[in-house]
């Protein structure tokens, strides 16, 4: 292997988008993925929404209260496992430090800037390559069950995105925006419609990226596990996989929640930890009437998204480390969420055929991704997007590729730099 080739660790959204961005800048790349197929972790069956209009981290003061109130509760939208507290202690202190209202608003603005940039790049590649991935550009609808929550969300939107187009809806407006909500609209105090948001299947997008990367000369190796990143005198000089030793002077770690462990072996502390999320995907083919908008119930951090002839219920946040158990209460929670939002649809679906899934979101301690150069020469990071991985993917990749190739970025990369201090 030519040591000028850049090794990208991770074949999910971040890794594949980075590979494509580097190829467009004239670089040679090889993507290494430990699973049998690309995009098998957080990219596989996520909520399927791109939300530049309200890309906010999960470290608001109110979210902190939800997390603390969910300690040990499997039926809570946000769960903190007592067993995971020791491993999350120092990360948690940094998370709390960034949860003041001032920090939350500042970080949210940074997220929204990157999200808007990312959306433009997503639209660009879709138009150029003719990508189709059950995508729709018809916005998202956030619903509220209390006036206080709605008022707070409207206020935050006006502060963070004063020029963005949003529609504040009453219960009648909700029914007009999404007719399938008509039966529950009287239970809602209102909603916010964000016309600039999009939906799409992240896994299908990744498969299209995979094909595109290969067509441009990039290599993608699946079933290839990284054992070690080789460092000599503060510089990258290769990686050891379970297949071979690859010589390279540049490595991008885009391994999601597993990035922390890979970097720990080379003496770097990355404040990114896994936050477990769940989804349930059901077939809606043949139904005469079905939802057209992604609907987000902000009170429980859950979204219901139409993706072609499927509907996906996704959400919840478990701070449990790499816990691979699928608790029955989570399946019931997702079913009950669908029933509460779309009772008519719920009664028509074959729940036995639904596909349950969980993944680990790579959550940074401050809510922003870590992008670019580390203190080790030739070692770069693209990780920490958390629940905004789909929303931030193309923009994150472009910034990392610009940093690697010394190209002037289109937006300020400083808030997201890998070497920032928390």
List each model region and its residues:
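Short beta-strand to alpha-helix junction loop
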Residues: 106-119, 142-152, 192-211, 325-330, ...
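N-terminal Rossmann-like FAD-binding beta1-loop-alpha1 element of flavoenzymes
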Residues: 4-31
